[in-house]
């Protein structure tokens, strides 16, 4: 009998620790089957079931996806825009798993995540060191919306037409300062002329940078580096790729702050549109160049919907749990 009690206790303990914070709370709340007089108007799928086409739509996706689609005004699950309650706990858990100081879940893709970061950090008159491989969302966020001035890092192209890495000469400080003299002469001799560098950590054609080398070569010229990791995000969990991960770097107050954006839906476990922003800059606290949470979150709310789809958020939470390991 004692052995069975111990086995049952162990099983209960395992189940209690199995689910991550937000998904656990969401599952419990859905099980309560509370009525709502707010959004969404389909009322747990009831509206769909009033028409044959809607009924097939409901049956195809299953009951829980409709019951889990609820109003962001429901305080039981915490506000996703101001990061409270179980939503806050989920993002703190993900930050721990991915070795970030803070993590923000983004439900409208890394296109939005990149705009959040670039809008928070850049303004007109700032210099941005800009990888030619960058996704158009970085062009939109840094150059069009924020109005920053670019200094471009040229990319190689091999005989097969594949776009490779940034040319080695572009990482030379003298070369970069010559480019600055053309774009913004008044900043050519500044100790840190670039407010931000935007690097495509993994290119569409499969080139992945050594993050340590990038930081060592240009980090002293930049307040921050954004590594757009839309096509990667798995590198820190593969020992032979550890040097490619910006989030595994040991950073000092003289290093740049690090942002990493990841398309979880591409190479990790997430529904389409799920993305996350990792912020690693506690080593800059107390410095004028530090980007506080309030500033970043204002940019976050600029690009976030006030009607988030909770299953997307839950998928990001579960993705972190999967990557936690044993």
Language-model segments: residues:
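Conserved PLP-enzyme active-site core in the AAT-like
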Residues: 112-123, 127-326
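Conserved N-terminal alpha-helix of the aminotransferase class I/II PLP-enzyme fold
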Residues: 63-112
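Short N-terminal secondary-structure initiator segments
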Residues: 1-14, 89-103, 224-242
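N-terminal "arm"/small-domain region of PLP-dependent enzymes with the aminotransferase-like
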Residues: 1-84
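Short acidic/polar alpha-helix capping motifs at helix-coil junctions
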Residues: 53-59, 103-106, 179
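Secondary-structure boundary/capping residues
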Residues: 35, 103, 126-127
